[in-house]
Amino acid sequence: MTLRPGQMTLADLRHIYQHPVKITLDESAYAPIQQSVDCVQKILAEKRTAYGINTGFGLLASTRIATEDLENLQRSIVLSHAAGVGEPNDDAIVRLIMVLKINSLARGFSGIRLEVIQALITLVNAQVYPHIPLKGSVGASGDLAPLAHMSLLLLGEGKARYQGEWLDARAALAKAGLQPLTLAAKEGLALLNGTQVSTAYALRGLFEAEDLYAAASVFGSLTVEAALGSRSPFDARIHAVRGQRGQIDAARTYRHLLGERSEVSESHRNCDKVQDPYSLRCQPQVMGACLTQMRQAAEVLAIESNAVSDNPLVFADQGDVLSGGNFHAEPVAMAADNLALALAEIGSLAERRISLLMDKHMSQLPPFLVENGGVNSGFMIAQVTAAALTSENKGLAFPSSVDSIPTSANQEDHVSMAPRAGKRLWEMAENVRGILAVEWLAACQGLDLRKGLKTSDALEPARLLLRKHVAYYEKDRFFAPDIEAASQLIALRHMNELMPAHLLPSL
């Protein structure tokens, strides 16, 4: 993959998250990188004072640093700021963080040498991933602690994972053919300052939300069939007169999945039903709103993934070094909060569809989707599990961006909490996956109870896939393994293949 700074797409970023990559930096980046370094060197030669180059940091910004201490200053900031806690991030997230940092630094506004950027690229290509703890950033003044842990490896400090094994830093560098670096003026701060960890966390949340949106669309369509629901609410004319783009596209997705008719729909063409419950009928409205939130969040995250969020910034053409606040991850935090709303609603609507299938008066199916009820409890407690997960997500959906706590002796007196905003999306996604696993099981059970009638051509593959791994419930059995099997299948992203093209931002 050739990296052209500032031009990465969401599809590129999804690929980097999901797969090891080999990166080459486009040569067009070399000149701007060198010009920014030359600008820093000129400031030092002229003995001008510039924050982050020859001063302390944060509340210590007014402290001038002697020339002979500048290299030690950069090493010290990395060592002192590597104060994260918690479990290490997995390789996929670390790889994404590193590529986002490379993409930002290579735009040529950070005053960092090509040698340092190439070292990060070499580590990514060799699949040597530094130990970056999950916790320790508030998403303002950048993701200082986690990015310091990333940068430790370049200095020969800390540890890294290579092929699943933890190695001390020098041994890990050797696997990539590297030696420890000595950072020059400005370089330590350039490595530490930025929103790359916050953005990586939120991107993972986006990718998982997209995958779950696809699965929920498929399983919601299966539930329409299992509950003998109508196709009329998905008619394009209904959605066109409202004009909401997400709703229009969601309805198109349901039409694509359900088709004009199926054996199931033909079996109840002439019935006395007038309207379906909202959890079936209003899927385009609810899922369309979720799709809109996801698209808006994706736009913000795509911009941030290509942004320069360092401080100070080096504008070599004018010879200026300017202090600002691009490290403040408020856009990322708000985008993640919107994704949380979408995830919560995707799960909530799915849980209501499960409940509908359980209720014999609503679905006209045996109570709890099992024959010989009383002796058998069927899906009774599986629905309770889905309800528990749904309720848990309501609490997790509380916005993180409205939380702030002052740090650094009140110099950094407002923060975004973007890492928390992004990281909780992973837990929410896991909960939604569990809810959707139950719906998939329930919808397929309901369809099997419809005398083996086939659903649409687009939906039959989803039904058959589940039945390859989970059998029909003739009577009660140990339920948890079936939920886990369905959940694992969802995690493989098969449902993405059933979506119309260009529906979801990164697919």
Curated annotation (Swiss-Prot):
Contains an active site 4-methylidene-imidazol-5-one (MIO), which is formed autocatalytically by cyclization and dehydration of residues Ala-Ser-Gly. It catalyses: L-histidine = trans-urocanate + NH4(+). NCBIfam families: hutH (TIGR01225), PRK09367.1 (NF006871). It comes from Yersinia enterocolitica serotype O:8 / biotype 1B (strain NCTC 13174 / 8081). It is an enzyme of class 4 (lyase). SUPFAM superfamilies: L-aspartase-like. One of its GO terms (biological process) is L-histidine catabolic process to glutamate and formate. GO terms for molecular function: histidine ammonia-lyase activity. Its EC number is 4.3.1.3. Pathway: Amino-acid degradation; L-histidine degradation into L-glutamate; N-formimidoyl-L-glutamate from L-histidine: step 1/3. There is a cross-link at A140-G142 (5-imidazolinone (Ala-Gly)). The lineage of its organism: Bacteria, Pseudomonadati, Pseudomonadota, Gammaproteobacteria, Enterobacterales. Its main location: cytoplasm. Keywords: Cytoplasm, Histidine metabolism, Lyase. The gene is hutH. This is Histidine ammonia-lyase. The keyword Cytoplasm applies.
